[in-house]
Amino acid sequence: MKIVKYKNTEHHEIWDNYVKTSNNGTIFHQRKFLSYHKDRNFDDSSLIFYEKNTIKALFSGAVIDKKLISHPGASFGGFVYNDMTFQASRDLIALLIEFCKKNGLNEITIIPTPFVYYNTYNEAMEYSLFHMGFQIKEYYISSFVD
């Protein structure tokens, strides 16, 4: 698996198409929404995770003060994916940690998509984050009307 840093001119369409067909992508992950915040003081460091030329996941994020964080232009961000197994989520997280170390980033803060927005309920990523030493620093409540 490999990580490619998002580039607007090359990846806009494939990013948005993946979000639309993903299990947990929302308007907050769409590039049009994230681009609205382009004049803010952060480096958009969104990432695309490929496995054999196929997108495995996206990560909408930014770098501020040597920290990779969920995109500050959205209420939540983090990983966007289709089907996710426990092992696949561990592999993605390990690759993200390795990427951060190689790029001199010393902290990762993720605000995951609330489960209410998932097409199919799946806690593999959140469990893997916990299992790999990530800590919950904040809780948010989400609800919706159908």
Describe each region flagged by the PLM.
Residues 1-31:
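Short amphipathic alpha-helix that is part of the acyltransferase structural core
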Residues 2, 46, 78, 109, ...:
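Generic structural signal for residues positioned in beta-strands
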Residues 6-7, 62, 82, 113, ...:
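Structured loops at beta-to-helix junctions and adjacent beta-edge loops in soluble globular domains
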Residues 9-10, 53, 85, 116:
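Residues that cap or initiate secondary-structure elements
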Residues 10, 41-42, 137-138:
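A generic fold-level signal
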Residues 13-14, 32, 95, 124:
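Exposed alpha-helical structural elements
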Residues 17, 34-100:
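Conserved donor-binding loop and adjoining core beta-sheet/short helix segment
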Residues 88-146:
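Acyl-donor-binding surface of acyltransferase catalytic domains
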